[in-house]
Amino acid sequence: DLYGNETWTMNDGAEAPGDIIQDAAKYCPRPFQKDRVRFEVADGTQLPYENLSFDFCWSLSSIEHFGGAEAAAEAIREMGRVTKHGGIICVASEYRIDDSSQRHPESFTREQIEDFIIPADSKLKLVNGMSWKLPPKEYLDNPINTLTEDVHRRKRHVVLRDKKVHWTSFMLFFRKS
């Protein structure tokens, strides 16, 4: 999940150097088997792979950038399409944990997760459910990171604040039936 058009990213607006797709080994700190890895540019809502191609699909903090809950659900359906029966899909994204009236397009509310993300594909069954237990209130009153300083990882939950929106991450595992 590398993006090339956000103003918040490094490398003159790109999250990664422009030649990383052509020469990934140049940026990898360890050797890897080049014949077993392929780097591609693709649209997460229209994956360029055959049905049932993969045993495992993983989306790490990507679907929140696709244009809302409906587009995120479409990306999960695409992951389901390319995952083999019995395969696993892992999705990590941002969860807006307060009921703030502030809108933040790159995080999901509980309702969006329940209405769009979890039920995106009827062939994908949530593994071990979803816990909605939130961190203690003092974590919300004193968030770890206001996007101006480093993340503090000694606390159990990492709660972030962007303006008045409090959010954290969630991770879901699905098994394809």
Where are these regions (language model features)?
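A short glycine-rich, Lys/Arg-flanked "PGG" loop and its adjoining helix->strand segment in the class I
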Residues: 72-85
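A short SAM/SAH-binding and catalytic strip from SAM-dependent methyltransferases
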Residues: 55-70
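A C-terminal cap/extension of S-adenosyl-L-methionine-dependent methyltransferases
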Residues: 130-177
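A short acidic, Gly/Pro-enriched loop at the edge of an enzyme's catalytic core
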Residues: 42-57
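Short, solvent-exposed loop/turn segments at secondary-structure junctions
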Residues: 2-4, 45, 63-64, 95-98, ...
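Class I SAM-dependent methyltransferase SAM/SAH-binding core
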Residues: 1-46
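Conserved Class I S-adenosyl-L-methionine
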Residues: 100-134
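Conserved beta-strand signature within the Rossmann-like core of class I S-adenosyl-L-methionine
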Residues: 86-94
